[in-house]
UniProtKB/Swiss-Prot annotation:
<keyword id="KW-1071">Ligand-gated ion channel</keyword>
<feature type="binding site">
    <location>
        <begin position="230"/>
        <end position="235"/>
    </location>
    <ligand>
        <name>strychnine</name>
    </ligand>
</feature>
<dbReference type="GO" id="GO:0007628">
    <property type="term" value="P:adult walking behavior"/>
</dbReference>
<feature type="glycosylation site" description="N-linked (GlcNAc...) asparagine">
    <location>
        <position position="66"/>
    </location>
</feature>
<keyword id="KW-0862">Zinc</keyword>
<keyword id="KW-0869">Chloride channel</keyword>
<dbReference type="InterPro" id="IPR008127">
    <property type="entry name" value="Glycine_rcpt_A"/>
</dbReference>
<dbReference type="GO" id="GO:1904315">
    <property type="term" value="F:transmitter-gated monoatomic ion channel activity involved in regulation of postsynaptic membrane potential"/>
</dbReference>
<feature type="binding site">
    <location>
        <position position="243"/>
    </location>
    <ligand>
        <name>Zn(2+)</name>
    </ligand>
</feature>
<feature type="binding site">
    <location>
        <position position="157"/>
    </location>
    <ligand>
        <name>glycine 1</name>
    </ligand>
</feature>
<dbReference type="GO" id="GO:0030425">
    <property type="term" value="C:dendrite"/>
</dbReference>
<dbReference type="GO" id="GO:0051970">
    <property type="term" value="P:negative regulation of transmission of nerve impulse"/>
</dbReference>
<dbReference type="InterPro" id="IPR006029">
    <property type="entry name" value="Neurotrans-gated_channel_TM"/>
</dbReference>
<keyword id="KW-0732">Signal</keyword>
<keyword id="KW-0812">Transmembrane</keyword>
<dbReference type="GO" id="GO:2000344">
    <property type="term" value="P:positive regulation of acrosome reaction"/>
</dbReference>
<dbReference type="GO" id="GO:0071230">
    <property type="term" value="P:cellular response to amino acid stimulus"/>
</dbReference>
């Protein structure tokens, strides 16, 4: 009886053992067929137990990491001449390969991770060399993207608003073409560890319908390499050049057309009567002051540069024409009043000449009496053989031809007034013709010659 119970217990234990083993094998089979959870996979891929160290670059002590970059421009604007910078909002995308992040355990070909995972992986130390100010975007969440592919490729995208320096050459302003650059450089890794390069296709993309208030962003993009050499080593650098052509519509309406009308307004004084001194002087001074204000306004939004700009030449010539119109009336007024000065000069000359003439005649008469009476010669002794007196002969030989009759004051006044009117008539044609010639040279030089030089550069 005892042996039978022992045998039955043994059989029962054997059955339980095999059933447990079978259940464990079934559970193991189920667990093998079930995919790993994302949390477990990430812990295994880059957690503390994975051995991944974000402080060490991929291929440590090996070949440099090649980082492919591209940018997508969301907005481009706020180009300031005074501070010589521009503002741009972009998506910056960087791609590189990290063999430590390659996987086969997870079924998906790529993983889109939360931005908080960025602190767990290695990232390039990219910075913008010509950056003056920048900020990230966090509304409604951090505008960052992290994607890891099965082969270890990493895509890191971030949205940034940048204020970048843009040195400008304003000699042709406002008909200029500016070139603004964006430089992407490594801060700490030399070219032995890290190399930046532009993406082969679509390195620089622009949002559809992107427009600028005063410029046209040209479609061709100039992509270059700008390797930097410092005391600490040779660092990788890439740059994109944006060519911006300024539109003249605003400046035509605000500067060129008003100044042109002011110059034309100053020519009205040539048709106003020269006797209307208050009208002509008031018009001349008003146009000069208005032109001065217009010229100052054109320089208010520009930096204080040492060279001459195209707008400076235009404003200076317009001011010169307006001021010359005012001086023209001064010349006309001076010429029209010259007859009064001439009459005053004649009166002074006649006043000084009359006493001298009387004195000369008295001396001449006194000398005659002395000569003839001293030698006892009377008037009869001065008769010649032909009956002509000596004195009469002398007078006939020394008399000058009679002077031309002088013009009357009224005739002189009319003569000088005609001369003044002639100056006005010449100015009516000369000023517009001179301004037209200046315009021809000005627009040909700045719209054709200078622009071709810029394109050739």
């Amino acid at each position: 009886m005892y042996s039978f119970n022992t045998l039955r217990l043994y059989l029962w234990e054997t059955i339980v053992f095999f059933s447990l083993a079978a259940s464990k094998e079934a559970e193991a089979a189920r667990s093998a067929s079930k995919p790993m959870s994302p949390s477990d996979f990430l812990d295994k891929l880059m957690g503390r137990t994975s051995g991944y160290d974000a402080r060490i670059r991929p291929n440590f002590k090996g070949p440099p990491v090649n980082v492919s970059c591209n940018i997508f421009i969301n907005s481009f604007g706020s180009i300031a001449e005074t501070t010589m910078d521009y503002r741009v909002n972009i998506f910056l995308r960087q791609q590189w390969n990290d063999p430590r992040l390659a996987y086969n355990e997870y079924p998906d070909d790529s993983l889109d991770l939360d931005p908080s995972m960025l602190d767990s992986i290695w990232k390039p130390d990219l910075f913008f060399a010509n950056e003056k100010g920048a900020h990230f975007h966090e509304i409604t969440t951090d505008n960052k993207l992290l994607r890891i592919s099965r082969n270890g490729n990493v895509l890191y995208s971030i949205r940034i608003t940048l204020t970048l320096a843009c040195p400008m050459d304003l000699k042709n302003f406002p008909m200029d073409v500016q070139t603004c650059i964006m430089q992407l450089e490594s801060f700490g890794y030399t070219m032995n560890d890290l190399i930046f390069e532009w993406q082969e296709q679509g390195a620089v993309q622009v949002a559809d319908g992107l427009t600028l208030p005063q410029f046209i962003l040209k479609e061709e993009k100039d992509l270059r390499y700008c390797t930097k050499h410092y005391n600490t080593g040779k660092f990788t650098c890439i740059e994109a050049r944006f060519h911006l052509e300024r539109q003249m519509g605003y400046y035509l309406i605000q500067m060129y057309i008003p100044s042109l009308l002011i110059v034309i307004l100053s020519w009205i004084s040539f048709w106003i009567n020269m006797d209307a001194a208050p009208a002509r002087v008031g018009l001349g001074i008003t146009t000069v002051l208005t032109m001065t204000t217009q010229s100052s306004g054109s320089r208010a939004s520009l930096p204080k540069v040492s060279y001459v700009k195209a707008i400076d030449i235009w404003m200076a010539v317009c001011l010169l024409f307006v001021f010359s119109a005012l001086l023209e009336y001064a010349a006309v007024n001076f010429v029209s009043r010259q007859h009064k000065e001439l009459l005053r000069f004649r009166r002074k000359r006649r006043h000084h000449k009359s006493p001298m003439l009387n004195l000369f005649q008295e001396d001449e008469a006194g000398e005659g009496r002395f000569n003839f009476s001293a030698y006892g010669m009377g008037p009869a002794c001065l008769q010649a053989k032909d009956g002509i007196s000596v004195k009469g002969a002398n007078n006939s030989n020394t008399t000058n031809p009679p002077p031309a009759p002088s013009k009357s004051p009224e005739e002189m006044r009319k003569l000088f007034i005609q001369r003044a009117k002639k100056i006005d008539k010449i100015s009516r044609i000369g000023f517009p013709m001179a301004f037209l010639i200046f315009n021809m040279f000005y627009w040909i030089i700045y719209k054709i010659v200078r622009r071709e030089d810029v394109h050739n550069q």
